[in-house]
Amino acid sequence: MIRSSIRPTVILPGYFAGATPYAALEQFLNQQGIPTVTVPLTRSDWFPTLGGQPVTPILKKLAATIDRHSPAGERINLIGHSAGGWIGRIYLGDQPYPDSSIGAAKIWQGRDRVSTLLSLGTPHLSQERWTKRNINFVNDTYPGAFYPDVRYVCIAGRSIYGDRGWRKGWTANLAYNSYDLTCGQGASWGDGITPVEAAHLKGAINLTLEGVVHSPGSAQSWYGSETIVAQWQSYL
């Protein structure tokens, strides 16, 4: 096990999400004695990434947050929800990643700052043409649990079966379409957005949690609900 003590933790929100929906998760982890902050994103921070553009603006805010939260260079634990998980994999990397703001590329080398990357409902696969640009870069350059000195923990939710047809209801239809765009198989189990198959990585510690939905704000439990956090917080 890589962890020898409780480390600072940083939460990276999912695509097009700000920090606010993660406030309860951040507070709960702090109450558990895990010093935690969320990358201070707003929805507008994501605008430059639309259409499959590089996620450089998000990586910059992630790097700045880690530097502030662990100024002495101590390795932290990184929680990436949804797209935050594969963006975290880019941050770990030691190969050039395009920087749209300067028309060049940057090596983030975040593996030196991260002890555990814990992804929550992250689609580590995609068939969607815009998302594929970034995810293909990640999977081609850093396949699976790529760095042996980083612990990868991938959490999938299993609550909604993808099915289509007006009799199935909008939740099952939405899940079917999302799963199909993600892994090419709509008739799958997942969290309503990410199918189980796509949320796991080869070589990682892969867990599947029953009854968990993708996003905060639902009447059902999501990855950051207190009873669910209790099932994965030991990896921090």
Place the predicted regions along the sequence by residue.
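Lipid deacylating catalytic domains
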Residues: 2-236
